Amino acid sequence: MRNRRKAVSLLTGLLVTAQLFPTAALAADSSESALNKAPGYQDFPAYYSDSAHADDQVTHPDVVVLEEPWNGYRYWAVYTPNVMRISIYENPSIVASSDGVHWVEPEGLSNPIEPQPPSTRYHNCDADMVYNAEYDAMMAYWNWADDQGGGVGAEVRLRISYDGVHWGVPVTYDEMTRVWSKPTSDAERQVADGEDDFITAIASPDRYDMLSPTIVYDDFRDVFILWANNTGDVGYQNGQANFVEMRYSDDGITWGEPVRVNGFLGLDENGQQLAPWHQDVQYVPDLKEFVCISQCFAGRNPDGSVLHLTTSKDGVNWEQVGTKPLLSPGPDGSWDDFQIYRSSFYYEPGSSAGDGTMRVWYSALQKDTNNKMVADSSGNLTIQAKSEDDRIWRIGYAENSFVEMMRVLLDDPGYTTPALVSGNSLMLSAETTSLPTGDVMKLETSFAPVDTSDQVVKYTSSDPDVATVDEFGTITGVSVGSARIMAETREGLSDDLEIAVVENPYTLIPQSNMTATATSVYGGTTEGPASNVLDGNVRTIWHTNYAPKDELPQSITVSFDQPYTVGRFVYTPRQNGTNGIISEYELYAIHQDGSKDLVASGSDWALDAKDKTVSFAPVEAVGLELKAIAGAGGFGTAAELNVYAYGPIEPAPVYVPVDDRDASLVFTGAWNSDSNGSFYEGTARYTNEIGASVEFTFVGTAIRWYGQNDVNFGAAEVYVDGVLAGEVNVYGPAAAQQLLFEADGLAYGKHTIRIVCVSPVVDFDYFSYVGE
């Protein structure tokens, strides 16, 4: 087990004996505002020089506060300069402070730590930082995006520093294995800090689905946790479709798949739903909760956004605190009068649990500033805004006691911090204790009493070679055997569950063995076609038509390349937004004769991005039809559809064609040659003679005869191994390469097929047989 790290960017171990600002200097009355603002902004330097923009405009602060100074300073901040109209200056920069008020660039540091992108097509933004105590290093993250649609998407990037001056890739980092080995000497406490010396922690094909990453380290579970705002490939105008996801990592470099969190934000004072834009999350041991300040908004974009407070006992399930904002824009003419932006905080413990102080560094914008005189950090109008300064970006400070803050947010003058609730028991349960190999199952974890304060759970497996369990409590069956899944909390509650891993009776049918059709489609490419559900890409979707709108119910059908005995169906909803996620459904098995039977139905699918798995009694089918009875917004969508056969999949038989010109064919009687591009290999034969025949001997298990139908044609008898197997009527509308006869399921061995004309005309194009 690795050494445990001390408090990193949880920012909860700080012991401060005096406020950073005297109470008289803080501008707001706590009876009206949850936080008291300092009268001016703080001076954060910006590296750029631009004749169209005022100097030192900055945003996206993230502040790390340590118990003891690190390389001379207890306060370290990562942030980005920013100006209106262009994003090329929005590159992560570093400052440090001894008091959280006066910020300096450490001697020898050259900002920004990440160079300006080569063109306006790309931009950096949304910085965050965490202290790694085990390695005694700072880890600075930021978001990078290719703003060109159809480009390479986005990345969460990382630079690391041992001294706060040189930021880059540690010399002990192996790029091939993505392993950062712990340095054991001063010579190893070095980084390569060139222009391209960064680590890509996460990459995505979408441009804006990992905005404002905020990272903490959990010393109890020995994991890093990242939350980010998913706005898909849209960004600023994605509106209420935004949502927050979280991931885990053992080392802060390689991250797991994201899981969407629940209830991150609620309603504002006007009853409108809030959507996230930027966030800062920390775990506060004093409260035994994850706490987040979220820059959020009601409406279509973040203009005029505010801060709200939201909390969680486990990091997954959240609850907004009241409906009042934590921080709002100031009065007209103030430096923060337009919009509160990405902000950072720490909770300073008080003399007792819940009696601490909330300290917030917040970025904000001042509006309508073009060519006007604007205030400096002391409040004096000494700065000339420039021609493209539609708004000015600054970073300021606000604070309040935690209790007073909560009294305002909850509109409860008598609020006191509730006492922490000790748990009596932790209980694990699962829908079954028998898990097939390759399958996953989510544990249910409950507490008594239900309001137990400490609900951060560490899961472990007694035998990861049999079954693994991740930080979300999701078990994966690895191999046949038995494993005990254990759960525990910081305060010592625990439980375990024995899981038997058995052979998996289901086999995934490859999507390449299926085709998809739908009763309604929108005419887009990444949003619309039924084929999108079989492309292996959850970011492309089938969508019912909405221009004009086709009312539900509507269906999407997957057809198989051969009959399968199927017993499981998986519906993967769209991953960005909820519009069209199916909530009520019917599932039909389609048989070879075209009939269909209902095999499953339901009306309780959640409007989230999680897979919906349906198991049903095994049935032989040539396809499955998913009928959307109800869906969000009255539409139907699907990102992916997958079907599982019950039992092993027999490979599709391989048919070998035998053309009419093949020397192994034996023709008797009069046969005429015919040429046409619609025939197999361009040729066929036909006979007008009753009794004329064609014969073929093969070794295999199945045989097919292909030829023409025509309104002037008659009939033939087909013999297999000398026994009449059927009479075939070839009369019908003219059509080439028609399957006229099929015999399958033959015992493997030598067989002979013979076609005899009994009523002219009879056509022969080719045989096709299954050999070895």
From Swiss-Prot:
The deacetylase domain is in the N-terminus, while the C-terminus has a CBM32-type carbohydrate-binding domain that is not required for activity on soluble substrates. The CBM32 domain binds preferentially to repeating N-acetyl lactosamine structures. SMART domains: BID_2. Residues 180-402 are annotated as: Deacetylase activity. It comes from the Bacteria. Inhibited by EDTA. It is an enzyme of class 3 (hydrolase). Its EC number is 3.5.1.-. Gene3D superfamilies: 2.60.40.1080, Galactose-binding domain-like, Glycosyl hydrolase domain, family 43. Optimum pH is 8.0. Residues 502-765 are annotated as: CBM32 carbohydrate-binding domain. Its cofactor is a divalent metal cation. This is A type blood N-acetyl-alpha-D-galactosamine deacetylase. Substrate binds at residues 87, 123, 236. Pfam families: Big_2, F5_F8_type_C. One of its GO terms (molecular function) is metal ion binding. The keyword Signal applies. 5 ug/ml of this enzyme pair converts A blood type to O blood type in an hour, and can be removed by centrifugation, showing the pair can be used for production of universal type donor blood. InterPro entries: Big_2, FA58C, Galactose-bd-like_sf, Glyco_hydro_beta-prop_sf, Invasin/intimin_cell_adhesion, Sialidase_sf. Residues 494-605 form the F5/8 type C domain. One of an enzyme pair that work together to convert the A antigen to the H antigen of the O blood type, which together release galactosamine. Catalyzes the first step in the conversion, generating the substrate for the subsequent enzyme (FpGalNase, AC P0DTR5). Works on many different A antigen subtypes. Glu-90 probably activates a nucleophilic water molecule to start the deacetylation reaction. Residues 1-27 form the signal peptide. Residues 515-772 are annotated as: Not required for activity on soluble substrates.
